[in-house]
Amino acid sequence: MTTQAYPMALVTQDSLDGYIRSVNSYPMLTADEERDLAERLHYKGEIEAAKGLILSHLRFVVHVARGYSGYGLPMADLVQEGNIGLMKAVKRFNPEVGVRLVSFAVHWIKAEIHEYVLRNWRIVKIATTKAQRKLFFNLRKSKKRLGWFNNGEVETVARELGVEPAEVREMESRLAAVDSTFDLPNEEDDSSSVSTAPVLYLEDKSSDVADNLEAQNWEAHTNNRLAMALASLDERSQHIVRSRWLDDDKATLQDLAEMYGVSAERIRQLEKNAMKKLKMAVGEI
C-alpha cells in the first residue's frame, strides 16, 4: 500500500475543505463489515479490502489531526501524516485481537503526527532525543499531578518515565518557556483553518499546547497497548486477567478456582505470571 494509491495523497492546504467533504462522504463501516474487510486483507491480502478500511476511516484522521492545531503547523500536513499512520495500522491490524480498527489505529495515527510535530515545530526544537520525546509528551501529565517539582518529585518523575533526573529538569525548563504562534487574521477568510505563514512569535509561559495533545493521546494509546498485550497471552491467562482486573463484576480467586478445577493458590500463581507477562508485553509494544 502506498499513499499514491488513495485520496490522502491529494491533501493540500488549498483543497483541505474539499478533501474533508470528500472523506466525510465515505460511509462508516458496521462491526461486521469491518471484520469482513479486515479478514480479507489479513488472510488473503486483498488490496480492495485495505482500500475499504482506509477510506472509511479517513474522517477519523481529520478529527485526530485537529487536536494538534495548537502547534501552528499546516492542517493539511497533519492530516497527511495521520493518513500515513492509518495506512500502517490497517496493514498491521489483526481482526482476531478483538478491538475495532479505530481503537487500534489511533496509536499509529498519533505516532506519525507526533513525529511530524517534533520534526517541524518551527519555533523551538524542544525534543530531539528519544528520552526528550518521552518527556515532551508525558511531563505535563506528571506536572498536573505533582505541581512544581522539588528534588524528590524530580526523582519520582524520572523513575516513572525511565529517564535521568537531569533530563526532567532540562525539559521542565524548556516547557516553562514554550513559544506560542500568533497569525494575523486573513480578512478574506475568517475560517478557523491554521495559517501556514505565522508572522509573530511571542513567549507565553501560560501556553500549554502539550496538555491538549497529551489528554487526547494518553488514554487511547494505553488502551490500545493493553489490548495488544492481552492478545499475546494464552486464553486461560486472558480470562483470569479480565475476570480479576477488567470486568465490572470482578471474580474472586475462589470463583476462578472452582471454574478451572484447581486451588485458589494455583489461580493466584497463574494471575501473577499473567500480569508479569502482560507488563513485559506492554513494554515491548
Curated annotation (Swiss-Prot):
PROSITE patterns in UniProt: SIGMA70_1 (PS00715), SIGMA70_2 (PS00716)
The Gene Ontology CC terms held by the record are: cytoplasm
Q: Which GO terms describe its biological process?
A: DNA-templated transcription initiation; response to heat
Location comes to: Cytoplasm
Listed as disulfide-bonded, the cysteine pairs are: none
Gene Ontology MF: a single term: DNA binding
DNA-binding positions are: 253-272
- Reported function: Sigma factors are initiation factors that promote the attachment of RNA polymerase to specific initiation sites and are then released. This sigma factor is involved in regulation of expression of heat shock genes.
The family annotation for this protein states: Belongs to the sigma-70 factor family. RpoH subfamily.
Q: What's the name of the protein? A: RNA polymerase sigma factor RpoH
